[in-house]
Amino acid sequence: MISTSSILVLVVLLACFMAASAQWGYGGYGRGYGGYGGYGRGMYGGYGRGMYGGYGRGMYGGYGRGMYGGWGK
C-alpha cells in the first residue's frame, strides 16, 4: 500500500524534475547533475554541489568536499 506521504513526495519530486527540465533543458542532469529540485548544482534537494541534501561538495549529506558525510577533501 502506497502511503499518502509517499505519493506527495513523488508529486513534489516530479514537479521539481519538470522545473529542472524546463530550466536546464534536460531533466535531472543539466548543470553538474543539478536536477530533482536541487539548489544550484546539488541533487535531491542538495544545496550547492552536494548530493542527496549534502551541503557544499559532499555526497549523501556530507559537508564540504567529503563523501558519505566525510569532512575535508
UniProtKB/Swiss-Prot annotation:
It comes from Caenorhabditis elegans. The modification Tryptophan amide is found at W71. It is found in: Secreted. Induction: Upon D.coniospora and S.marcescens infection. Upon physical injury and osmotic stress. Transcriptionally regulated by the transcription factor sta-2 upon activation of the innate immune response to molting and injury to the adult epidermis. It comes from the Eukaryota. Disulfide bonds: none annotated. The modification Tyrosine amide is found at Y29, Y39, Y47, Y55, Y63. This is Neuropeptide-like protein 29. Weakly or not expressed in absence of infection. Upon infection by D.coniospora, it is expressed in hypoderm. Also expressed in perivulval cells when D.coniospora spores adhere to this region. Expressed in hypodermis upon physical injury. The gene is nlp-29. One of its GO terms (molecular function) is neuropeptide receptor binding. Coiled coil: none annotated. GO terms for cellular component: extracellular space. Keywords: Amidation, Antibiotic, Antimicrobial, Cleavage on pair of basic residues, Fungicide, Neuropeptide, Repeat, Secreted, Signal.
